[in-house]
Amino acid sequence: MAMAMAMPSSSPPLFFSLLNLMLLLLLLAPYCSAVSVPNNNTHHRSSSPTQTTLQQLHSPDSPPPPPLPTPTVTTPTPPPPPPAPRPPRRHHRIPPPPPPLLPTPPPPPASISPTPAPPLPPPPAPAPPPTPTPKFPSSSANPSPPDAYPFTNYPFFPNFAAPPPPTQQQQQQPSGDGGLPTFPANISTLVHPTQRPPRRFPVLQALLLSFLSLCLLLLSALLSLHLFRRLRHRHHSHSHPNARSPSSRSGATNHHHDDDGDGDEEGRRLKPPPMPTSSSNPSTEFLYLGTLAAPPQQPPPTTSHLRPGSPELRPLPPLPRVGPPSGEFASRSSASDPSTAPPAAAEASSSSLSPSSPSASSPTLGSSPVHLRPPSIPQPRGRAPNPSPPKRRPQPPEPMAAHAWNPFVPMPPQAPPSEEEEEHSPSEKSMRKSRPLHSDKLKPGSLHMKDEMIHLYLNNSMAAAMPREVCLLGAPRCHGIGMLVGALGISKEQVREAILEGNAHGLGVEALRMLMQMVLTNEEELKLKYFKDDLSTKLCPVEAFLKAVLDIPFAFKRMDAMLYVANFYLEVNQLRMSYATLEAACQELKNSRLFHKVLEAVLNFGNLMSIDTGSPNSHAMEPNTLLKIVDVKGADGKAALLQFVVHEIVKPEGHSPVCKTNANTTQQYDVEYRKHGLQVVSKLAAELSNTKKASSIDMMKLSRDVSELGVGLGKIHDVLRLNSMVTSADSARRFHNTMSMFLRQAEEEILKLQAQESICLSCVKEVTEYFHGELSSGDEGHMARVFGSVREFLAMLDRICKEAGEEMKSSGWMMGRDWNMAAPMGMTTP
């Protein structure tokens, strides 16, 4: 029995080797049988000439046969000496009856030549009847009749003398005469066998056996792999007892860990040992779970419901003591030598007897020897065992005496712990690392809950008492105002403080504009003002912000006044800069010598061309007329009037004092004069820069802005009048002081701005009358058109100067006196 139980742990390698060897032999057997099986037709054909030759050699009456057609044999070898005479052997075999011979004409003698037979063609579908071979003459004149059983009456080796070897002449003589050597008469009835198709059964059998052998080999390999993994898993589970479930660890204390521990465990699982016949004589070689604890003795329960072969009644073998005393019981043979036990058993025994172990704490298991632990259920593969916290190892008891193995004898008291064991505190023993729990994989902040949520779920009365938010203005309105409040980034306390003090610069222009977008209607203001918070309802955060603002008297009127204050100085500065630009443009047009010279030259050429150059009272040509003669071309169709004017002005402007000192001849420095004059003319656009800026200013808009600033001062006076009626003197006084100071400064700035406006208008009017003459009452709004015309003329002059500079580099100058001007717009020249 022990050998059979130990076989699964030790025999698998040998068993697998034998199984693989047998399968390999089965795999090679078909090939060996296919090689060893001969062909019946070939053997029959090859054996007939051999037997015939041997009979010819040992026959005394027959001559030797002709030589075989083999090219390698040239001369016949002498025959071996004859053997000793032996009695003839007769075969007592009853041969089958010969087939009936049909009388057919003999074939011609030419077919009996010694030449080798040609290869046989494949047999036709209908097999022809067998043709008997011709009867050749024997050594005597009269041939003897053929015998029905030629191979039975004559021995295989007759006792006759060997004939002499045939000569070359005899071999060359043709056969057919009576004296020539021929085949013996006893084989004259041989019939050449007909060719049959080869049989394919051995090849198919070999392939079939090979396929079956390969399937068996694969099946055995899979079985070997399965058994190997199973044994490895079992060995791993025994070597790591901490990975088991608590029930498996508690049951591991009753297993016998020795060399054949795996085999014993498998044997006990397959077949439990028989039950003891009586409990009066308990065996001392088995360990019962009742000895692990000493509960109060109770009457044994009935065991009529338990079968003898039940696993609950299976006794457990003694367990060895491992390492230091660990509180487990072992056999007497292994208790004296604790070093013989493997360390794996020590870990299993130390982790099994824990305070939470069910086998050690159940009082019903130790009441009777028949109550035994059921077999441990193995954990299913692929599922991790249930984790458990680290167990505390109990203090080991003293070694038990021989009589203590009786389950009915009480255990002696345990000895006090030693000093070495006291050094290891329970906290240090419990520091052993255990398997991580599923809760350890959670993030630290995932279990965090707010205090409000805890109160909401734990105290329902508190949650019921919380006020409910209401929205008086409606969800869309509150959403829009909430976006503005969020964009402000200012608390309602800061807004209230700035409005009460009138600090416009503290909030800023953007914040005041956003607050002005929250202006409410009278109905909405009344709803928010007369709403009172209670325990059941409260306003939403947006409406609470608006209510805090509306608590200030005339809040939105104050914000409007503060927005005017924040924008006042910015608008005043812009108006001052615009008026200053207009005044500078007027001064540039009056004081620019080069501009007047260009205008005078254009006026002279215009008069020569009979072009209306403006009103008769004007001192210069209108800017609009300058734009008309820009595209007038000369006789060659290339040079324009403005180009000729520029060329004529460039030469006198180029005679600077620096150039005159170095001018010895006019022809040498003529190009330099023109180049210098071109630079002077091209600077005209830079001298009239304010004129270009003034062309984009709308004087009518400037007048409206000054008027609006004066109207804004009236709003400030209205807010101060309303603020004086507020009962709260402190808040009203602060706002009144701030606004009163601003009013005094704003009135002074507006007066200065109005004076500057009048001066600017007079200058613009004077420049306009210089070009256009006296203006009527309806043309006062179009006085700034002169700046736009001058800007366009300067742009064309700048373009012509650039073209002249490029021509100077590429070719010579075209003189004005060589030009023939064409009359533009259908007019003729004088």
Swiss-Prot record:
Endpoints of the signal sequence: 1-34
Ranges of Low complexity composition bias in the record: 149-160, 324-369
Keywords linked to the UniProt accession: Membrane, Signal, Transmembrane, Transmembrane helix
One GO BP: actin nucleation
Database matches in PROSITE patterns: FH2
Location in or out of the cell: Membrane
Comp. bias intervals (Basic and acidic residues): 424-446
Pro residues composition-biased segments: 61-86, 95-135, 314-323
Domain FH2: 390-823
A cellular-component GO term for this protein: cytoskeleton
InterPro entries, per database record: FH2_Formin, FH2_Formin_sf, Formin-like_plant
GO molecular function annotations of the record: actin filament binding
Compositional bias annotation for Polar residues: 40-59
One Pfam assignment: FH2
SMART domains: FH2 (SM00498)
UniProt membrane topology term: Single-pass membrane protein
TM region positions: 203-223
Region (Disordered): 40-195, 235-446
Family: Belongs to the formin-like family. Class-I subfamily.
Protein name, entry field: Formin-like protein 14
Organism from which the protein derives: Oryza sativa subsp. japonica
